[in-house]
From Swiss-Prot:
<dbReference type="GO" id="GO:0003985">
    <property type="term" value="F:acetyl-CoA C-acetyltransferase activity"/>
</dbReference>
<dbReference type="GO" id="GO:0009098">
    <property type="term" value="P:L-leucine biosynthetic process"/>
</dbReference>
<feature type="binding site">
    <location>
        <position position="201"/>
    </location>
    <ligand>
        <name>Mn(2+)</name>
    </ligand>
</feature>
<dbReference type="InterPro" id="IPR013785">
    <property type="entry name" value="Aldolase_TIM"/>
</dbReference>
<dbReference type="InterPro" id="IPR050073">
    <property type="entry name" value="2-IPM_HCS-like"/>
</dbReference>
<keyword id="KW-0028">Amino-acid biosynthesis</keyword>
<keyword id="KW-0479">Metal-binding</keyword>
<protein>
    <recommendedName>
        <fullName>2-isopropylmalate synthase</fullName>
        <ecNumber>2.3.3.13</ecNumber>
    </recommendedName>
</protein>
<comment type="similarity">
    <text>Belongs to the alpha-IPM synthase/homocitrate synthase family. LeuA type 1 subfamily.</text>
</comment>
<feature type="region of interest" description="Regulatory domain">
    <location>
        <begin position="390"/>
        <end position="506"/>
    </location>
</feature>
<dbReference type="InterPro" id="IPR054691">
    <property type="entry name" value="LeuA/HCS_post-cat"/>
</dbReference>
<dbReference type="InterPro" id="IPR036230">
    <property type="entry name" value="LeuA_allosteric_dom_sf"/>
</dbReference>
<keyword id="KW-0808">Transferase</keyword>
<dbReference type="InterPro" id="IPR002034">
    <property type="entry name" value="AIPM/Hcit_synth_CS"/>
</dbReference>
<feature type="binding site">
    <location>
        <position position="13"/>
    </location>
    <ligand>
        <name>Mn(2+)</name>
    </ligand>
</feature>
<dbReference type="GO" id="GO:0003852">
    <property type="term" value="F:2-isopropylmalate synthase activity"/>
</dbReference>
<keyword id="KW-0100">Branched-chain amino acid biosynthesis</keyword>
Length: 506
């Protein structure tokens, strides 16, 4: 049975989702979790896009040990060399070079002839192969490219040294029958077909990204590209967790097994959702809150008698387990550290001390600490530690009518303390006005969302905010048992990003 490899582009294509703005530390958190998920290749970013992207790609490349780290590049020498500088320190570096092959792209975007495109493919892949052990070539907008020319372009790329050929459905235009037929056509029409691994990359504009990816596997694709939770620009990408579980459950049909640690799916989905601020729909397949819920009396009766009557996926398969008690206020530092290691977290002594202190504070207020609490705690403390400013004091009191007054004290990375107070129509507005006064910002609150991320009256709150000033928009999040504290943390997280970005642009 063939093994299907997965190329995750959450950190590149996924980050292009409107409103998503991950910092370097957040990208590294996701990369480490993708490594635990067993992702074969992770596209860490587009190194030539900016200095920030370059540094993020480089740090991920120098950190990840058990996956190939890849950078995107246009078919330009400067892009390719920049990508090499970013990922050369990786255990397994790869170049992903792309060039459009459809008539509409060649005419209106590239202003290049077919001959020019073929020449550019050959030169860019040849250069890439002289620097990288493996090169992936993507024929952008392949599904709207004339088949004979696509086959010619693919052959040129393979002869130039490409190890992986990606056939992307860039605008989500195709359907499963057409996509399957396209892979079969290339299998028959490309003389050097057997010398490369063929890959699929599907967008969800018509709601068929997962179905198209599975059709590509039927047609001979050995690598599937996509993102966690299906995030991405426009309608998003193929959700890798859905493709992987579909292959596993229906291996009788696809004759293929996913090369992925399925039990890490839920944890990965949750991390990506919270860091990006993109909430997973409750009825989403595999990872939605209702994915394993049964409300119908007939269904409940059937499941109680025999679970397979209405459940084709065991929740434990994807790491969806009961919210079991694991630690309490009497748990010591050693037990805490061992449990965090079991969950896949590693940190320095200073990081451990900070998270353990936060754990003890939570344990004093919450009788039972679950794995979900620990994951949320780690997520919140990691974001808190990476901020330019941290909240050291927060006070809110009633003034008159609906007016509230908030006093906020912040400390920066150098230990400088800043304090200010402001009023507002409610506690949240007062807190945010005070933070704006301290940081000297005049930004608009574009989005504010709050959700409970653990169960019970003593649940942890996760607050996501988006701030906008002019053309600049950033997001931030905060985790705490107290809603006001979580809200303040989220605002400081986003405001610090916004201030840094504005200073960088200036």
């Amino acid at each position: 049975m063939k093994q299907i490899l997965f190329m995750d582009t959450t950190l590149r294509d996924g980050e292009q989702s409107p409103g998503v703005n991950l910092n370097e530390q957040e990208k590294l958190q996701i990369a480490r979790q993708l490594e635990r998920l067993g992702i074969h290749v992770m596209e860490a970013g587009f190194a030539a896009a900016s200095e920030g992207d370059f540094q993020s790609v480089k740090r991920i490349a120098n950190t990840i040990q058990n996956a190939t780290v890849m950078s995107l590049a246009r078919a330009k020498e400067s892009d390719i060399r920049r990508a090499y500088e970013a990922v050369k320190g990786a255990v397994s570096p790869r170049l992903h070079v792309f060039l459009a092959t459809s008539d509409i792209h060649m005419k209106y975007k590239l202003c290049m002839s077919k001959e020019d495109v073929l020449d550019s493919i050959y030169r860019s892949v040849t250069l890439g192969k002289s620097l990288f052990p493996t090169v992936q070539f993507s024929a952008e907008d392949a599904t709207r490219t004339a088949r004979d020319f696509l086959a010619e372009a693919v052959e040129v790329a393979i002869r130039a040294g490409a190890n992986v050929i990606n056939i992307p459905d860039t605008v989500g235009y195709t359907n499963p029958e057409e996509y399957y037929a396209l892979f079969k056509y290339l299998q028959e029409s490309v003389p050097s077909y057997e010398k490369a691994i063929f890959s699929c990359h599907c967008h969800d504009d018509l709601g068929m990204a997962v179905a198209n990816s599975l059709a590509a596997v039927e047609g001979g694709a050995l690598q599937v590209e996509g993102t966690i939770n299906g995030i991405g620009e426009r309608a998003g990408n193929a959700a890798l967790e859905e493709v992987a579980v579909a292959l596993h459950i229906r291996k009788d049909f696809y004759k293929a097994e996913p090369s992925m640690t399925l039990k890490e799916i839920k944890a990965t989905s949750t991390l990506v959702s919270r860091l990006t601020g993109m909430v997973v729909s409750k009825n989403k397949a595999i990872v939605g809150a209702n994915a394993f819920a049964h409300e119908s009396g007939i269904h409940q009766d059937g499941v109680l008698k025999e679970v397979t009557t209405y459940e084709i996926i065991e929740p434990a398969l994807v790491g969806e387990s009961q919210n079991l008690f694991v630690l309490g206020k009497h748990s010591g530092r050693h037990a805490f550290t061992e449990k965090m290691k079991e969950l896949g977290y590693e940190f320095t002594n200073d990081e451990r001390d900070a998270v353990f202190e936060a754990f003890k504070k939570l344990a004093d207020r919450k009788k039972e600490i679950t794995e979900e609490d620990l994951r949320a705690l780690m997520l919140g403390e990691a974001a808190f530690a990476a901020q330019q400013y941290n909240i050291t004091q927060l006070q809110v009191h009633f003034v008159s009518n609906s007016t509230q007054c908030a006093t906020v004290v912040l400390k920066d990375e150098e230990g400088n303390v800043f304090e200010d107070a402001a009023t507002g129509s409610g506690s949240i507005e007062a807190i945010y006005n005070a933070i704006q006064r301290i940081l000297g910002l005049e930004c608009e609150l574009a989005d504010y969302r709050i959700q409970s991320i653990t169960q019970g009256q003593d649940a942890l709150a996760h607050v996501h905010v988006e701030l906008k000033e002019g053309a600049h928009q950033v997001s931030g999040f905060g985790v705490a048992q107290d809603v006001l504290e979580a809200s303040a943390r989220a605002y400081v997280h986003a405001a610090g990003k916004l201030k840094s970005f504005i200073q960088l642009v200036k």
